[in-house]
From Swiss-Prot:
Catalytic activity, as annotated: 4 Fe(2+) + O2 + 4 H(+) = 4 Fe(3+) + 2 H2O; Fe(2+)(in) = Fe(2+)(out)
Chain sites annotated for binding Fe cation 3: 46, 50
Species assigned in the record: Escherichia coli (strain K12)
Subunit structure: Homooligomer of 24 subunits, arranged as 12 dimers, that are packed together to form an approximately spherical molecule with a central cavity, in which large amounts of iron can be deposited as a ferric-oxy-hydroxide mineral core.
Regulation: Iron oxidation is inhibited by Zn(2+), which binds at the ferroxidase center with a higher affinity that Fe(2+). The occupation of the ferroxidase center by Zn(2+) also severely restricts the ability of BFR to form an iron core.
Record protein name field: Bacterioferritin
GO CC field: cytosol; membrane
Length: 158
């Protein structure tokens, strides 16, 4: 089914955001693991996998709309050098992605591509959940102090 060119462009932009997130979160997860921060490793690793699932959905939708998924134009990874910087980098990436999603959702709705819109709304819910988690973790660092926060990250999630 031939899709709206601008919807496909939005989907490719969102795909690019996901590809950056996959790599950034995966590297952050492994850095956390290397530092012995098991809980942060677990959460970041699962976020990386979630972003991969989002990317897969974008790729399938782009192909369905007879577009070509762009996996070559990757944005810049912002890899932090310490825990707080890493969480802030991830938050900035998520906030930018959510902004792009809202814009794309509005456009898809305006051209009556309700399937793309609904898919993006589902993904936005996931992204907002990750934003909330990141904001909470950064708030905990401020309230508890970094050393107490880090001590709490040694345990495994769950």
């Amino acid at each position: 089914m031939k899709g709206d060119t601008k919807v496909i462009n939005y989907l490719n932009k969102l795909l690019g955001n996901e590809l950056v997130a996959i790599n950034q979160y995966f590297l952050h997860a492994r850095m956390f693991k290397n530092w012995g921060l098991k809980r942060l490793n677990d959460v970041e690793y699962h976020e990386s996998i979630d972003e991969m699932k989002h990317a897969d959905r974008y790729i399938e939708r782009i192909l369905f709309l007879e577009g070509l998924p762009n996996l070559q134009d990757l944005g810049k990874l912002n890899i932090g050098e310490d825990v707080e910087e890493m969480l802030r980098s991830d938050l900035a990436l998520e906030l930018d992605g959510a902004k792009n999603l809202r814009e794309a959702i509005g456009y898809a709705d305006s051209v009556h591509d309700y399937v793309s819109r609904d898919m993006m709304i589902e993904i936005l819910r996931d992204e907002e959940g990750h934003i909330d988690w990141l904001e909470t973790e950064l708030d905990l660092i401020q309230k508890m102090g970094l050393q107490n926060y880090l001590q709490a990250q040694i345990r495994e999630e769950g």
